[in-house]
Every structure is written in C-alpha cells, then in structure tokens.
C-alpha cells in the first residue's frame, strides 16, 4: 500500500516514494503463529575505570594513567555508540510498524466509508421498496374486489399472465377480474408477505453487520498505536566527557616535569575520578537500559500491530461478505409481480384500449392515403399519356416511334398484424368516466385521459412542418408534395389559420384606432403649403369635394349669369382653384395610401423580425436549458461513475490480492507436491533397490535352497553309504572277530563286536597314538586355516578402499589359497595313508591278532574324529568356493570403478569446456549491459566499493566533480579478460583463487542497480510517451473539433482553402467586382463564374477552393500607356492591364483572387419567400445612381497616390499569403461570422473597400 492507504498500482509504482508490504502468513494465519521477536540485548558490564598509579611523584606514571583512562573512555564511547545506533534502528523499525498499521487502518476506513455510502443508498432503496410492498400487501384484496366492479367488455386474448384461466374469455361482457388468476393472486399474496418479512430481516441483518463493522473500525481507531518515543541523547554527553578526558591527556603530555605540575595533574585526576568517570558509567547504564526498552517496545509493537492487522483482516473479510450481500440484495420471488398486476390491470386495460384505437386509425389513414396517392398517380399517368399521344400526333410525319407504356405506380400495404378487437373512442371515454366515478382511481383516469389526448397530438414530423423554424433556421420546404396534406396536417393548419385570423382581427382593429387618432391629429395641424407630411393616417379619403366647397361653387355658378365680366373671371379663377384643390386632394389621398401600405409593410417586417428573433431566442434558451440539464445529469453520472470506479478498483485490488494469495497457496502447494514427488521418486528408487535386493536375496535363497537340497541329497547318499559302510563294517567286524577269535561266538550288535575287537586291538595302541598325534596336527592346521579365512575376509573389506591393495591382496589370497589346497591335498594324502594303515591293522586283526576293548574304542573315536574332520574339510572347501566368488565380484567391481573413473575424467573435461564457455558468455553479457547503459546515456563507475550508475552529463558536468570522483576512489567495473582462463590453472589452489577473482569481478557489476536504472529509464520514457500521447490525442481532438466547427462557420478575419466566405458586391459599379466580407483582411476578390449568377444576387455564400496571390505591377505599362485604362487607345494594352489589374487597384498592392463554389447550389437568390433570417435590410432612402464623393475621398486619394517605390517596398506587400500562416488559419476557424457592428474598428484598407450607405443600399433596393 501507499502512505495514503491506497493499493499500489503498477502504473504509479515509479512515482511512489515509499510503499508498505504485508506478509499474509502472519495476517491470515491463526493466532498460534509465533513472530520472530528480537532477542534481548546481552548484559552490559563496563570495565572498571583505570585507577592504578605506580608512583605518585613520577610524571610518566600519571601520563600512563591518563592514557589508560583515555583508552577506556574511547572504548566505552564506541560500545555505547553501537548501542545508541541499535536504539535508533529499533525505534525506526517500531515507527515503521506503527505507520504500517496506521496505513492499513486508513485503507480500512476508506473501505468502510464506501460501504456506509453504498449501504445508505441500498437502505433508501430497500425502505422505498418495503413501503411499496406493504402498501401492496395491505390493499391487494380490495384491489382484487375492485376489479370485479370495473367492466371490461372487450376481449383481448393476449392480456393477462400465462396462468390466467381461459374459461371466461369467450364471454361478450365481463370485468377486469377475468384477466387475473384469483388463485394465483391468493398464493402470491401469502408468499409475498413471507418474502417481504424475509427481505426486511435481510435488510436488518445487513444493517447489523454494517454497524458491527463500523463499531469495530471505530474501536481500532480509538486503540490506534502510539507514536514511537525518541531516545535520550546521552551519547553526546558521553562523547563530551571522552573529549574532555582526551584533551586533558594531551594537556598532561605537554606539561613539564615539576612538583607544581604533579599537583595540578593530581587535582585533575581527582576530578576525573569523582565526576567524569562515574557520569560516563551512569550514562552507559542508561543507554543500555534504553536499548532494552527499545527492544521491548519493538516486540510489543509487533504483537499489537499483528493483533490489529488480524482484526483488520477479519473486518475486511466481513466487509467483503456484506458488500456481496448488498449487491445481491433483491427480492427473490415473483409473487410481488403477481400482486402488482392487480393494481396495474386498470391502467394496462385502458392503455390497450387507447392503443387499439391508435392502431385502427393509423391503418385507416394508411389505406386512405394509399388510395389517394394511387388516384393522384393515376391522374398524372393519364395526363402524361394524353400529352405523349398529342405530341406523337403532331410529330408523326417526322419521327417513327412506337408508343410506349407510361410507367405507373402500384401500392401495396404490407406488415398488417392480426386484427385487434374493434374499439371506438366512445369506449375509451366511457371507461375513463367509469374510472373517474371511483375516487381511488382518479390518478389512473388522469393518466388515461392524457393518453387519450395524445391520440390527436401531431407527430414530431407534423410539428416540425407546422413551424417554419427549426433551431433558428428556415425549415427545408423542398420536400415532395405527395402525402403531406393529411387530415392531421390539415387540422393543424386550420387551427393555426384560425389563431392567425384572430390575431389579425385584433391587430386591424388596433390599427384602425391608431389611424383614426393620427388622422384627427393631422387635421388639426395640417399646413397650408403643399409640403405634406408622409405620416398621414391611412383612413380612406373621399374623391368628392366636401359639401361647403360644392355649395359655394354652385352658388357662384348661379350668380355668374348676373355678374359682370370681372365677376366671371373671378368665378373661373375660383373654379380653377377648386379643380387644383381637388387634384391636390387626390395627390394627398394617393400619398396617404402609399404611406399606409408602406407602414403596413414595415409593421409586418418588424413583427416578422421580432417573431424570428423571439424564435431564435426561445430556441437558444431551450437548448441552453437542455444543455444545463444534460450537464447536471452528466455531472451526477460522472460522480456516480467515479464512485463506481473507485469501488471497482478496490474490488479489483481485493480480487488481485485474493488471486495473489491463491497463487501463493498454489505455488506452495506445487512446491509441496514437487517435494512429495521427489520424495516419492527417492522412495521409489529405494523400493526398487530394496526390491532388487530382495530379488537378489530370493535368488540367493533359491541358490541356497538348491545347494541345501543338493546337500540333503548328498547327506542322504552319504547316509545310505554310511549304512552300507556300517553293514560292511559289521560284516568286516564279524569277519575280524571271527579272525581274531575263530572259536568264539560272534556278538549280535556292533558295540559288542567293537568291544571284542578293542580287546583284540590293544596291541595296535602304539599305532593309534601316532594316528592321534597326526589328527591333532590336522585340527590345528584347520584352525589356522579358519583364522586365515577370517583374515582374508578383513582383507577383502580393506580391499574396498584401494584398487591397488585389492590387487595385491587378491594375489596374496590366491597364493595362500594354493598353499591351503596343497595342505588339504597333504591332509587328504595323510588321511588316505591312515586309512590304509587302519585297513592294514584291520587286516592284521583279521589275520589273527588279538586286541582289547580299549583298542576298539579308540578305533571308534578315530572314526568319529575322522568324520568331524571330513565335515570341517567340506566346510573349508565351501568357504574357499565362496572366497573365489567374492574375488570374482571384487574383480567386476574394480573393472566398474575403472570405467567410472574414465567416464568421470571425460565428464570433468566436458564440464571444464562448458565452464569456459559459460564464463565467456557471462563476460560478454556484462559488457553488453555496460554498453546498453552507455547507449541509454548512463556511465557505470565503482565508487568506494559500490557500483554507481549516473548520467553521463552529471559525471562530465564539471572538472571539480571529476576530481572529487577521482579522489573518492572511482574505478571502472569492466571485468578483466585474463580471468576467463581460471579453469586452466595447474593446481587446485590456484584454480580456486582464479575462480574467486573471476566471481569477484562479476560481483562488482551489480545487476540490481543495472535493473533499477533501466526500469526507471523505461518507466520515465513510458510516462513521457503517455504524456505526449495524451497531449497528441487532445490536440488531435481539438483539431478535429475546430475543423468541424470551422467547416460550417463563415471566415472573415483570414482566408484559406476550404473556408466558407460571404461575398458581397463592391462600390465599383463599372466592373461589378465582388469581394469577401472581411475584418482586417482586404483585397480578396471573387473570380466570377457562370454558375454563380451574380447579376441576380445581392450576396453569395461559397466555399473557397483556390487562392491565387497577385501583386499589382503597373511598371510594365508605364512606358507608353496612360494610367487611366479608359484613355488607352489600343485593345492589347487594355487587355494586359485587365489581366494584371482587373479591379483597378493601385500599384504595388498585394491582392488575392479566389475560386469558390456555392455552398448550397440551387438556393434562392434572396432569402426565401421574400424574407430574411436576419434583421431587415431595406432602408427607405432615395439616392442617385451616379457615384458621389464621400468625406473620406481625400484619404482614399492619398492612399492610392502613394509613391510606387514605397508601396512596393512596404512590409504589407512583402507579406506571404495569409493561408500559409497557421495562426491566421486558426483564427479563421475559431471566429464566428457575425454582422459587422457600428463600433467595430476597421483598418484603412477595409475603409477603402467599404462603401457609403446610399451606394450600398442602391444595389439592395434592386432586389425583390
């Protein structure tokens, strides 16, 4: 997390100064996990201060004492400095632990705040929903009863829920109850009550959980860890005492040797003993106590922080659960939909009635309009056919053309849906009146009444056609005349016409009153002269003279017969004056009529302009209101989306953390499974070895069994042989007894015979003694042989250690084995001799010698010993055979060891070559990394034993910095290439030294520092790239926006290709030149084209397609031509001057010729229908067609008669075209085309291009 309690993001990781990392194992594990606490510091026992003085009167003894105390003080300061450093480190760690817990708490507070806001919104929504549910549950039975009393005569099969019974659908009349399933509503009412209670309990549970989370969070805030305490600065005081002792020692060193010096030194030493040394001991004890306190505080902080983190983790788990409950907070049953359908059924039924009428009328209108259109097209087709026949008849002598069929139109109506029930407007009105009669359904009746009124409301297209203005501009009336005079439009036009007639009647009555008042006022103040005022009333004047004048003329004519000639002359004069008076009256009446007509026209124009202005202002105000509402809506949406974005980011962080935790668990599980798999592999191998051993044991056992079986067979065979031998011996003994005692009776049993023979064999005792001695020697030799076999076994075990010893021992064993075989052969030969002697003795006994029983017993014992010796001999032979087998096995092992040695030598050589290649690759990689850093603009140096990566500009910034680097031990980190041959050393020690040097050279290049530098560089580049990309995107959007805005705006400050310009005629009537309306950018003239039809226009709105820059140069025609082109006699000179200066500009003036295409071809020459969208431009004035000198004529003459050289050399003539300058181009796109106001300052050139009001209005008065 960051220090602000936010989760760290990869995008902003490079901009964070510090981050806090937490170990999930200690946070999410149960409480029995033990923390790695800091051990208590070792007991501190300072040495006793030196106080031994050999001689009080010897200065050197005092110096030695001072030096010892100085050394003691410095050593104590060093030890206390280490403890003080440990105290500061422990305090820093403790402070970090406190801050980490505080950061986690801040993060939790943010989550809890978001949870409270979300819960408040959810609770508001839930409370409103519960109110609606309670209201629905309280009155659904009454509403269901009410449906029974509301008639519903029309049958709509599609109305109602799918479960609604259909048995009453065929009835011609019924109620709204027929469209509702009463049983389903009853069940839904009971289910809705239970669901509402469950939903309320769910809201209460969520509220209780939120309150619990808030209370636990507040408890954590109240129990927040305190800040770490600063350790007392006793080390500085101890250093001060040590410096005092050192300075005293230096002072003592410089003192002379006399009694006064000794006295001063003694007093100073006493001060040390009483003040300084005890104070240093006390301070050291305080520092050690502070160290113990820091360790204890650190361990306590770890435990408390761990408890807080576990509490925070538990709260966050609960918080995630509550958030999921809030998200999933909803009614899980459709019962309320069924209940609400009871309330909505009256409105739904009424809406269906209105919709039925609307669809029926639309279908009828479509049919009628299609018939009308078909008839009209048929009339057009018949007229066209008659015209073609008439034309062919008149042209029949000149052309030969077959009569073709005139194309016609066939109209078909498609997409008609199935017929709805017939519903009239009276049905709707009666249904609404029935609803109005019920007080509880007044609001439903009002809604249906509004829907019923909307049947007669014009559509959006009809409203647009009813109004002549669309957002401040005249609506396009160039649509087809077909299908536009529908009944709705005619009805709307009649309404508009009636409204306008009423307004016109009121206006006419008001105008009559005003004219009458004006006429009365003018009669009172009419002048005598013939200069009548133009503001006479418009009341109709009688063409006949008034009664007084008529009576006077009649009387004068009557008296004329009785008058004299003078009287007749006077009478004629009176008649003439009366005729003139009548003519003058007629003139006055005509002028009054013209003034009245003009006043009416001006009044209409003013009213039209004011109505246009009001429409424009209303449109602007409506759009402004729409914009304000949209802005407020968008601001609310933006705030909502920001909150949602933060919530999603937090959710994403939690999901990422959970995924990381799951990934960590999966990794641990994978590692555990891999370990178990390895253990299983090892166990499998052991089992395989064990199985192989068992197989070998089984094979050995089988072999042993076979040998035992063979041995049993041999023993059985021997037993049978022994039996046969016994039988033979019995027979032999009987024969011997018979030979020894021919007359005696032969005993039946062998022992009796043997005893008898022993008695007879006493004479052979001497020979038996000799045989015993030889047997004893054979037994001794057998024992020696057994000992030798044991020795051979030990020697075989020793042979495992060395191959050479095995060979020698093997040879020795072979020799000894041969000797033993020879000895065995000798023993066998001796046994054979003994047996032969025994047989000889037996034969001698058989010949007649007598023996005793003792001799017989000796013979039996000898035979027994002989059997034992034979058995031992067999065992020795078996052991000899086993020894031969072991010798063969050792030979095979020796051979395998030799092959292994050869393979190991080959593998070591291969590994040496690979190690060399690997070392070379590592060396090249280090060089590539250094080269990469150099390419990125870094310099890699080693300063004071640490690698430093700096910018090359910083390293080479100044010579002073370079000198300081050189003094601080800056060296290159590039490894030495000679270290690559470390594996080619002659001795093992040398190879080890070279290899360690090679590793040391590689360790000098710190990959972490390299990675940090490269990552920081890449992140800086990415940050800069994102910044530039964002700016480029903003500039591109701004450019597109300005370009789109400029495309539809009139440019008047500067011009470039593609700009929209307003062209007006200039005052030059002779050549009828047209120039662009401008402010500060004169001399942009239009190239006239036939498509422009400028003779019938007062203005032209066109888009510039091409701009040609030209400069007037009259020097070409100054040598032989008059400046005035009207005085030139030749046509060629006139033509050249027209090409160079077609608009009669002064010499050296820069001007531009524009090619432009009309923006809307086919537009009327003047604003449509004799009207204008801006203020009226008609001015009541009379002027002469001749050109007049204005007051500014002198200035114009001065400007046009400047020096040719000065005008050619002026900066205005040397300027480039304005369309080549981006700034003017931007101004042309940014400025709006507004009518020039009276107070807008114009440049002198613009004043030259401007015309007098009379001359400008003269052209405008020629319009319609």
Swiss-Prot record:
Keywords: Autophagy, Coiled coil, Membrane, Protein transport, Transport, Vacuole
Gene Ontology CC annotation, any one: vacuolar membrane
Subcellular location: Preautophagosomal structure membrane; Vacuole membrane
Ranges in coiled-coil conformation: 566-887
Residue segments, region Disordered: 528-567, 1118-1140, 1180-1264
Polar residues composition bias: residue spans: 1190-1201, 1240-1250
Membrane topology: Peripheral membrane protein
Source superkingdom: Eukaryota
UniProt GO BP: autophagosome assembly; autophagy of mitochondrion; pexophagy; piecemeal microautophagy of the nucleus; protein transport; reticulophagy; ribophagy
GO terms, molecular function: molecular adaptor activity; protein kinase binding
Primary localization: membrane
Low complexity: bias regions: 551-564
Residues annotated as transmembrane: none
Ranges of biased composition (kind: Basic and acidic residues): 1254-1264
InterPro entries: ATG11, Atg11_C, ATG17-like_dom
Subunit structure: Homodimer.
Function comment: Involved in cytoplasm to vacuole transport (Cvt), pexophagy, mitophagy and nucleophagy. Recruits mitochondria for their selective degradation via autophagy (mitophagy) during starvation. Works as scaffold proteins that recruit ATG proteins to the pre-autophagosome (PAS), the site of vesicle/autophagosome formation. Required for the Cvt vesicles completion.
Assigned protein family: Belongs to the ATG11 family.
Protein name (database record): Autophagy-related protein 11
Native source species: Aspergillus fumigatus (strain ATCC MYA-4609 / CBS 101355 / FGSC A1100 / Af293)
